[in-house]
Amino acid sequence: MRVWVPVGVLTSLAYCFHQRRVALAEQRAPNGQRPVDRNLLELKMVQVVFRHGARSPLKPLPLEEQVEWNPKLLEIPPQTRFDYTVTNLAGGPKPHSHYDTEYRKTTLRGGVLAGQLTKVGMQQMFALGEKLRKNYVEDIPFLSPVYNPQEVFIRSTNMFRNLESTRCLLAGLFQHQKGSAVIHTDEASSEVLYPNYQSCWVLKEKTRGRKKAAISQPGISEDLEKVKTGVGINNGDDVDFFVLLDNVAAEQVHSLLNCPALERFAQLIEQRAVDMALYVVEQEDRESIQMAVGPFLHILEGNLLKTVDPTTAPSKTRKMYLYATHDVTLLPMLLALGIFDQKWPPFAVDLTMELYQHQESKEWFVQLFYNGKEQVPRGCPDKLCPLDKFLNTMSVYSVSPEKYRTLCSKTRIVELGE
């Protein structure tokens, strides 16, 4: 692995490092005594958590004039092709996908099924893969230019749009190559890459109650009635700001938004969807965030700890971890890290954690990026965050499988109700 040292023979590489957002900076070290010379930082590990690419809506709006979703929207761009196989977490057969079975029950006008990755989404994910290739293959020699399972671990939720999004990302990251990548996924009953209402009854009950209460909040209820009336949706129809945003976002990204009223209300719809989400998942309600994404944060935390542990066998770590997730995963994660920007996580957005080690002091640092922008996580002094401080931030919401089971126990529903 290349060590970044400030000597003449590495001048061009140092320049690339500069171009890659980790240039020399007048940044104070944690003790405040000296700046951190970023030329002495060696990249050790990267974790990328991303939302799938653009897709068809999950549930159409009950409007007389329905948007037409032509099957041509699902055509696969040749450059995004990449062979992959799907296994369970233990390497066995791919689990059944309950969600995909449900999506097949809804056909949108034009013939496209609900929740399907589109050509636009495939191109978005390919572009994200190309960005990762530039950052970690071309600008610095961190990853091999071809897929190597000893370097990259890939996990996705067991939904076709996420598996296909991962395929497109891999095509952008590793280009065309022979051989197949392995994507790991889990049973719906134990999945932790999204808030799991199937395995966590307490979260399900709390979310149901708070979602119902959110809709009746002053301002939200009036705006919902205004939007529904404006676009011609009966107040009796089961449509909230989440359903509205799902359709607006999908139609906008495919240039299919042909309802002037929906277009006029688009910004309000997104803001109110965010307001509802923040009401449902309160930042002050530590347990709600723990139940939503705590087990996933525990996995990310574990990857960091394994990498910095000198006793960890090389076969137990990877240079890069890729996780295909959802907007409902990213939003509580951003809240947990203190970097939520008050905007709904867009299609193909990524949250990237880079782990560095200083070659002289041997100190560890984390640099966090969301949607391509450097972030300062809660509890961190600056964008380059000492690992211990970053872990302290994660530990507030990270939960072990045992703690998760305790939090989600059905017996706690009665306790909380009392």
Curated annotation (Swiss-Prot):
GO terms for cellular component: cytoplasm; mitochondrion. Disulfide bonds: none annotated. The active site is at residues 52, 327. GO terms for biological process: hematopoietic progenitor cell differentiation; lysobisphosphatidic acid metabolic process. The keyword NADP does not apply. Residues 51-161 are annotated as: Substrate binding. One of its GO terms (molecular function) is acid phosphatase activity. It is found in: Mitochondrion. SUPFAM superfamilies: Phosphoglycerate mutase-like. Keywords: Hydrolase, Lipid metabolism, Mitochondrion, Phospholipid metabolism, Transit peptide. Pfam families: His_Phos_2. Its EC number is 3.1.3.2. Residues 1-25 form a transit peptide. It catalyses: a phosphate monoester + H2O = an alcohol + phosphate; 1-(9Z-octadecenoyl)-sn-glycero-3-phosphate + H2O = 1-(9Z-octadecenoyl)-sn-glycerol + phosphate. Signal peptide: none annotated. PANTHER family: ACID PHOSPHATASE-RELATED (PTHR11567), LYSOPHOSPHATIDIC ACID PHOSPHATASE TYPE 6 (PTHR11567:SF202). Belongs to the histidine acid phosphatase family. This is Lysophosphatidic acid phosphatase type 6. It comes from Mus musculus (Mouse). The gene is Acp6.
